């Protein structure tokens, strides 16, 4: 039985920090978007994202994927710092003190609230050193046309940087399936960079996700 006095004395349990209605604030007259702490948010139209892909492809060719990936790594580094600061202050504990399921749920809601689609993590291959990350309704996949390969390089860079800082290991992320190519989701394999060296070639050869994953695991065993 919960004591009434405890309910009156103890602070209210924190809810979902990244709940859209509470996290995103807007002023239509000024054209401003802010988060619940007053930090500025930036809304990017799909035409702008499409122009980034088209322009980089025309100017840099195949190097466009590296440019976007490195932009994602830089973005992910700053995103990780802000993410940790915000949830640590709200939940009154450090990221290291949080249960992994609690941390991932925060990241999932954050991903969705920022308009990046949905995000999920599959940890069943951690015994071999790999994490499988899955996103759906990616704004990046929806604007990149005619690349004939997975195109969410920004997201791959974000995942690489975010989880590298979270784990203290130098991790790398490579996309294996993409909504831009008709897949129902975007899948990424996350692991140590030296273990993922063969993946880029397998993706270029058109190998499916399961085949690539089996190849990686067999190379370790």
Listing of model-derived features with the role each one plays in the protein:
Residues 1-131, 137-154, 172-221:
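N-terminal accessory segment detector
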Residues 152-168:
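Active-site helix/loop of acyl-thioester processing domains in fatty-acid/polyketide metabolism
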